[in-house]
Amino acid sequence: MLRSDADITAFRAVRQILLLVSKVELPVTPRRELEALRGYIETDASLEEIPELPLQEFKDASRALLAPYLAAVESRIWSGDWIPRHSSGALATREMYNSRHSFRTWTERLQSFLLWEDELAFSYREIVDNLDDFSVLAPDQEPPSKVTTVPKTMKAPRIIAEEPVWNQFIQQGVLHVMTEVIQEPRFRRLADIFSWLDQEPNRELARVGSVDGSYATFDLSEASDRVSLQLVEALLAQHPFLKGVVLASRSRTAKLSTGDEIVLKKFASMGSSLCFPIESMVFFIIEAIAWAEHEGMVPSALRVRGLPRMRVYGDDLIVPQAVAQILPRRLETYGLKVNSRKSFTTGPIRESCGADWYLGSDISVFKLRVPFPEAEHQFETISRTIEFHNNAYSAGWFLVAGQAELSLNGIFRKLPRVPVGTRLSALWSWDQVDSGAVRLDPKLQRRQ
């Protein structure tokens, strides 16, 4: 129980000590990994058909609020004003590096909306030259996405899916169009409410809520795994071409490391390039439906300009206090689950997008994510240890930062020091700055 006159400095210090190593990314035991994979299967199996009335309300709200935006995205893809692309993520079909740019496989589902001759070939000559070694897979020939685990905490791993190369190629292209369109001036108000680009509005709104209680913050459990295919089909119902492209680039089955293969009832697992933006839209629509209920409106009467200040970033939701009791019930209607441990509707604490607030004071903590490095080849671990050092140093925990620095000094003779806040992979310092190592020479491609 928190005292009403709690000292902010003491409160922040206690939280920092207790949470410092709460999310170290270490491999879990085989038993915990198996439990996580079983939970993945059980969650997907638990997704039920959404009742007709709530589903229609969802369609009505989607049409009222997102039709212009989704139509603009659809128009870009339909007209060919887009470029499918790859990301650096691992692939279920195992292509590495440059080989992912020369794949020779497509699917009938994709071909129904996007001809491989248009999306993959640079010229008619290339089409002719590749006809013999190009294959178009029937739906029952498509490989599943590959579900795997990566370290998250010592309690449970994070579960992600690796997509086949052709699916990822299209997903990334659609994501790029969605991102460009949402940044257009005509959709500024929409972007103020939901986003997959900027967390700061969430953090600021959470701060305001901690001061006057005017906003409630919600976190969802298993958010990606609980967004059903049925819900996404309803979201895109008025845009058949866009819906076709999105669903054709979606893996319908998933294969787990246990050997189990399941037909997915969810829209997509974490790892799909469209998982985050699509779920952001879904959660935005549900927030709006909750507001409509509070106002006594039908969802079809909703308008973007008539909505109050609210916010969605992935599964971090913020709504006015007036709908704080309505939203959880609405979320559950659509198969979603509120994480009550990380949701705050009353009291002086609010949390969103990694920022924690108590009566307007920042009580966020820094966390050790990986064990300290032991060798030069641990590039990512070294980079993240430098980041940990800088977070600890800027927060005033100099002895903790010193331990990180000692581990790095055991590998490198000397790491450069730069002013606090500098965006370089170097140790932050308030005073001991190596002035000759704070500029990146673009020609020599090294720090000067």
Language model region names:
Residues 126-448:
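Core nucleotidyl-transferase/polymerase catalytic module
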